Amino acid sequence: LKCEWDGLVGTRGEIAKETIER
């Protein structure tokens, strides 16, 4: 989901990654 989320969000991938990781 990380890869897919990163691609879907794009620039917001970094923010989403931090939220998902936490």
Swiss-Prot record:
Print the keywords alphabetically. Answer: Disulfide bond, Protease inhibitor, Serine protease inhibitor
Q: Looking at the keywords, is Disulfide bond present?
A: yes
On assembly, the entry states: Heterodimer of an A chain and a B chain, linked by a disulfide bond.
Q: Which organism is it from?
A: Theromyzon tessulatum
Does the keyword section mention Disulfide bond?
yes
- A Gene Ontology molecular function term of the record: serine-type endopeptidase inhibitor activity
Q: Which family does it belong to?
A: Belongs to the protease inhibitor I13 (potato type I serine protease inhibitor) family.
**Name by which UniProt lists this protein:** Cytin chain B
- Function of the protein: Inhibitor of chymotrypsin.
Leader sequence range is none
